[in-house]
Swiss-Prot record:
Name of the featured protein: Nucleotide-binding protein Sde_0533
Keyword flag Metal-binding: no
Similarity remark: Belongs to the YajQ family.
Keywords, comma-separated and alphabetical: Nucleotide-binding
Organism (species): Saccharophagus degradans (strain 2-40 / ATCC 43961 / DSM 17024)
A GO term, aspect molecular function: nucleotide binding
């Protein structure tokens, strides 16, 4: 029986490149001259530091633009609320890897509500879809792509 897995992954190398490009753009932008602003990359998250809340918003826009240019979906980021300490502001941007249980349940419910004849199973941080016909699986792919589930999805292990 044909099957495939629905996963949500972010290419860490592309994200790191986007953060480095954003750091480079910060050093060349006129509105950030003489301002203490920086991006700090850690595994699966980036910390933005600036002197003002408005500048954090601009930095987030720069980061989103660089992510899009590197082929990373901007829906794959979660931003925390800006934190003010002393004269600097900081904000943590986390990158979503894997499908959380609540999102996986929404995916399963959306597929089952569509009445497409497939079996759906949650397996850790991925969702396995199995069906009798390849066309049914392609319908499920289209359904998941068009669904507004707050997270980008990729399809792997397509077996015929």
């Amino acid at each position: 029986m044909p099957s495939f897995d629905i996963v949500s992954e972010v290419d860490e190398q592309e994200v790191r490149n986007a953060v480095e490009n954003a750091t480079r753009e910060l050093s060349t932008r006129f509105d950030f001259r003489g301002v203490d602003a920086s991006f700090e990359w850690k595994t699966d998250q980036t910390t933005m530091r600036a002197e003002g809340d408005f500048q954090l918003g601009q930095m987030l826009d720069i980061l989103r633009n660089k992510l899009v240019k590197r082929g990373v979906d901007p829906e794959s980021i979660d931003t925390s609320t800006p934190v003010h300490s002393g004269k600097s502001w900081s904000q943590v941007v986390t990158f979503k890897n894997g499908i959380e249980a609540s999102v996986a349940k929404k995916v399963v419910k959306a597929i089952k509500d569509s009445k497409i004849k497939v079996q759906v199973a949650i397996q850790g941080e991925e969702v396995r879809v199995t069906g009798k016909k390849r066309d049914d699986l392609q319908e499920v792919m289209a359904l998941v792509r068009n669904g507004e589930l707050g997270q980008p999805f990729q399809f792997k292990n397509f077996r015929d």
